[in-house]
Amino acid sequence: MFDLLSEEMVYHIFCFLDLSSFIKCSRVCRKWRRISDDEKLWNLYGEFFGTNKPIDQYIGWRKMIKHVTDSSDNYLYKELTGSIKTYGIVVTNSSVKQSLISKSSIPIQYSYHRTTKFTLKYYRPNKTINQIDNDYRMFYIVDIPEYYTNKQKKCMIQKYTSVSRDYDWINIFVFICSNTDVPYVTSITNEISARIRVITIDEINDAFDWIGKMIWRQDLMYHSCFCPREIPLTQQELYAMTNFNFPKTKLLKTKYSSTNDCLSLCMVQ
């Protein structure tokens, strides 16, 4: 029955499934499993930060979530929906920008399913990483002086992002620059494997909202190398994603339901 569908048709349908349905349909038969190994397909469903195959990174993420939810009454769900404090470093020479950044960080920001309160520590650009007294916080906001040469700007970006190589929990960076510098700074940051946003100072409020979302996604990864692209829109959906106490019969029915849905889509196409 499944062999009657061409590989092109199955691939096309896989592109329209959600992550859960995609996983279940990948188990239908060997042919579908082989098609589902395509990395381009997986990039539609998640972000991958490791070197293993996407399916292996996904399985590792599910195992970690299962462990934490089974052992502590869905601890992860409570963490993802509760209020948190998060700490960051701001590097700037400008007292005016420091004031703007400080004011933007005071309100408690609502990001996805929880509120985040930011606590910042300020440093001057002439401080090296070592001179920051090993104060390795979760994220960096770096103000790039407009009078710097392109070489100095590139060195500054590389200096601060290099900390993520030794401290893998630090991979969220916001670089503030002038409108004219945005294209150049963006071209440099595009070569760096981290969560990076390039902004002007006028966009600092949006930047804090973005930081809150990135930290939320990082918590959802729970020390794994995978993060789903499709984030639950409601707390009910989030609970379903992080809860593993469903009866096996329900899971079995869901599997066949997803398979039938996929076949129905194929017939429509």
Swiss-Prot record:
InterPro entries: F-box-like_dom_sf, F-box_dom. It comes from Acanthamoeba polyphaga mimivirus (APMV). Gene3D superfamilies: 1.20.1280.50. Pfam families: F-box-like (PF12937). The lineage of its organism: Viruses, Varidnaviria, Bamfordvirae, Nucleocytoviricota, Megaviricetes. This is Putative F-box protein L127. Residues 1-45 form the F-box domain.
